[in-house]
Amino acid sequence: MKNKRFLFIFALICITIFCIIYYIFLKFGNNNSKEKIVDEILNSFNVYEADVTVTVYSNKNTNNYYMHQIVNHKVSRCIINEPEDINGLNIELNNGKLFIKNEKYNIEKVYENYSEVLNNSLFLNTFSDDCINNGYKLKESEENEVNNNENKDEIIIETILENNKNTYIKYKELYVDINNRIPKKLIIKDDKQKIYTSIIYNNVKIK
């Protein structure tokens, strides 16, 4: 009788230990798998094309811009489609220089230190660099939290620019479709976590 009881307790302990080890392994495996996927996603932003809708928020009004982005490693270019008054404006970042062109208004300028003129946070490769330099963490989407969605088709990659002197650009959150690994939107927040810029991505082509 004592032997049977001992064997039962021993078996119960073994099962409990197995369950704990399995849970830890499963959790670690999922986290490791997600981190690997995120690294692959961030590395894919070096070469891509996309149609983007940029919304800039301020205390007084909201401005929308529609543009096409072309990124090839260190060369980042966007062509403004709307609003109409700046249609055709071509902005290119190349080797630390900013090129601004608009044939309609016969404009062509080159700035040696573009960081003082234009922040290049609009581009996905800049987001990748920010994650490399500042680290990142994965957040749960509000939809998954509310609906307790176990599929989790969307992941949110957040990076915090602690040393950025521009108080309007402190937090960045990139929403990515986990199935096709295509970015959906980028939210940029100020130092008070108020949304400063929203960027919606359409027709994204990762090359």
Model region roles, listed by residue range:
Residues 68-122:
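An acidic-aromatic
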Residues 115-116, 120-129, 135-136, 140-141:
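C-terminal low-complexity, charged extensions that often adopt amphipathic alpha-helices
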Residues 54-56, 80-83, 100-104, 161, ...:
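Beta-turn initiation residues at beta-strand->coil junctions
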Residues 45-49, 69-76, 92-97, 150-152, ...:
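Short, solvent-exposed coil/turn segments at beta-strand boundaries
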Residues 61-67, 85-93, 167-169, 194-197:
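Amphipathic hydrophobic-ligand
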Residues 136-207:
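Gly/Pro-enriched, hydrophobic low-complexity segments
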Residues 58-60, 71-73, 82-84, 178, ...:
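A generic beta-sheet turn/junction motif
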Residues 2-74, 205-207:
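N-terminal leader/targeting segments and the immediate start of mature chains
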